[in-house]
Amino acid sequence: MNISNQLSLEQEFELVLYKQKIEPLNLEQSRNLLAETLRTMLLKDNIIKYVIKNSHFSQ
């Protein structure tokens, strides 16, 4: 496994907390949280792309 595919200890802890948060949710609440999480991940991707595009390291 590549090191970039591994989670840090902090990320592992965050994952455990997230699992605890979703455990009591019903199906509708779980679906809503999943949609919110996906939206957040897509926004994060956009921010990363923007930073890379506008950095001094882009070619």
UniProtKB/Swiss-Prot annotation:
Keyword field contains Plastid: yes
Cross-referenced Gene3D superfamilies: Phycobilisome degradation protein NblA
GO CC field: chloroplast
Compartments, as annotated in UniProt: Plastid, Chloroplast
Pfam family, one: NblA
Superkingdom: Eukaryota
Disulphide bond pairs: none
InterPro entries: NblA, NblA_sf
Primary location group: plastid
Keywords carried by this UniProt record: Chloroplast, Plastid
Family per record: Belongs to the ycf18/nblA family.
Protein name: Uncharacterized protein ycf18
Organism, as annotated: Pyropia yezoensis
Protein encoded by which gene: ycf18
